[in-house]
């Protein structure tokens, strides 16, 4: 059986890094995504929550980056 999970802390760090490299503020990114809550982006970046798949696709487009370079996947075996 294959058991994977998304490392939300590292994924959040990737989102923050990509945003900063793009020269975008959190407010600007929020507006580009089309969401009303700035706190949502802060929560993603702190690793407290994951964006929806729709928002991940939008982030991938905004940053011109494949999803697998935004999302960090780990195997449960990595933590044993």
Kindly label every feature range from the protein language model.
Residues 54-69:
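DNA major-groove recognition helix of helix-turn-helix/homeodomain DNA-binding modules
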Residues 1-5, 61, 71-80:
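Short, charged recognition helix plus adjacent turn
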Residues 16, 27, 57:
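Residues within the helices of the helix-turn-helix
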């Amino acid at each position: 059986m294959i058991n994977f999970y998304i490392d939300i802390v590292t994924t959040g760090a990737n989102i923050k890094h990509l945003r900063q490299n793009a020269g975008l503020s959190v407010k600007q990114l929020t507006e580009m995504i089309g969401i009303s809550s700035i706190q949502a982006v802060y929560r993603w970046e702190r690793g407290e929550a994951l964006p929806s798949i729709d928002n991940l696709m939008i982030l991938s487009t905004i940053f011109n980056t494949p999803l697998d370079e935004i999302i960090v996947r780990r195997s449960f075996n990595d933590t044993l």
